[in-house]
């Protein structure tokens, strides 16, 4: 006789446990690639369960495998667990205890959800018809990210398909969002230094003013997006920092800027990078300046595989969650590296709640999570295992 399980009911029974684990981790946020406390916390939870543990994978990663009694598919889920250099301003009992650091992007929630899923799988491991691999990843917030290091160290060995989620405060609790194909952009970073000739502010003719030339570069660079790229293609070029000089009457020797480029394909990446360099070459020729440009390509765009996306959609609908097709998002995620080597899909789990005042955006010192979202994400993962015929 086939045992039929109510995944939402099982996830709901784990709600208080997932909330407690999230709050434990929320009080101990750690920067990317330095997640020692969190690494050990996750290991301590997993050691209570009947699973094979491999650690460290890469630097601080953990791989937990639940092995079924029967042969079948090998499905992986991933959660990240690093925090951000943000000073938390929430007045809550589980506020960060680490000065200057905060779980301001929900990674504590991601990990708590996956640990809750692990406990449910452990309790029903006699039903497994394949293997379930849980990947706990460090260092998502800072390039080059932890995913590629974990892949290189074998975290996807024998895995057939991989899924992941990101809690999202911009969507209400009880919703699941995803889309086939591209869903998240490649987040490139660049910096430019223009070297002119400093001098007295009253005698600009005796100088080569790098501030004016930098201003010309910044304004002209915007035309790369608006005038050289097909308007139906998504691309963003943003300058986030400009730095030059220290006095009102001194023209400095140099000016510096930093920014980001967001695209969904490598051709656009190359086009924008090339155009920026050509623009600087022209300014150098016209103004007798020199320059340095450092352009760093970020994570690959996140591209969901069509069949895995359909599984996410089916799971949400069968669980009576409110499924919606996501908009294209210009944020970056190193989950993309898993999807380059294995089929799979990434989805967003709504965790916003206007009535509770949980509306702050990610990376904000007031960011928080409607913790009721945990049971929705956990039940979605479990339903995916059922559809994939692992549970």
Annotate each predicted stretch with a short phrase.
Residues 2-103, 108, 112-128:
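Acidic/His- and Gly-rich active-site-bordering loop/insert found
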Residues 3, 14-21, 34-45, 73, ...:
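General structural feature for long, well-ordered alpha-helical segments within catalytic domains
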Residues 25, 64, 77, 107, ...:
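Divalent metal-coordination and catalytic microenvironments
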Residues 26-28, 103, 107-110, 166, ...:
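Histidine-centered active-site/metal-ligand motif
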Residues 28-33, 84, 141-142, 246-248, ...:
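Short, small-residue-enriched loops and turns at beta-alpha junctions
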Residues 62-63, 84-86, 91-102, 108-109, ...:
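Histidine/acidic-residue-rich, glycine-tolerant segments that coordinate divalent metal ions
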Residues 215-391:
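Metal-dependent amide/peptide-bond hydrolase catalytic core
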